[in-house]
């Protein structure tokens, strides 16, 4: 059994999907996606916020290497990270919302706390 969910994609497509979902999450602060994608991306988003809390140049460059949009990185470091200055983890939550109409895929909302 795999240690992570493959989500029906090869490794490069999966990495691109995770980067896109993380970028969208920090841009919108709340996204609806499948439950499997939300759970897979949740830990990556938490790591990015912890990185942003460090706030140094190296952390910013590491975030820029992962997040697609530079303006989203700026928002992460200037607006989102200070919000969680006194919080040690648990920056996101997954709320199950039922199933998608077309294919009955379990859906969930991934949002910043």
Swiss-Prot record:
The keyword Transmembrane does not apply. GO terms for biological process: translation. InterPro entries: Ribosomal_bL17, Ribosomal_bL17_CS, Ribosomal_bL17_sf. It comes from the Bacteria. One of its GO terms (cellular component) is cytosolic large ribosomal subunit. One of its GO terms (molecular function) is structural constituent of ribosome. Keywords: Ribonucleoprotein, Ribosomal protein. Part of the 50S ribosomal subunit. Contacts protein L32. Belongs to the bacterial ribosomal protein bL17 family. HAMAP family: Ribosomal_bL17. This is Large ribosomal subunit protein bL17. The gene is rplQ.
């Amino acid at each position: 059994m795999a240690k992570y969910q493959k989500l029906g994609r090869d490794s490069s497509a999966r990495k691109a999907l995770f980067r896109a979902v993380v970028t969208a999450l920090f841009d919108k602060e709340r996204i609806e996606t499948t439950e499997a994608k939300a759970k897979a991306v949740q830990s990556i988003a938490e790591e990015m916020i912890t990185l942003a809390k460090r706030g140094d140049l190296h952390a910013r460059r590491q975030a820029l290497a992962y997040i697609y949009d530079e303006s989203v990185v700026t928002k992460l470091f200037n607006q989102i990270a200070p919000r969680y200055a006194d919080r040690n983890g648990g920056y996101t939550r997954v709320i199950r919302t039922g199933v998608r109409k077309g294919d009955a895929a379990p859906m969930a909302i991934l949002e910043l706390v």
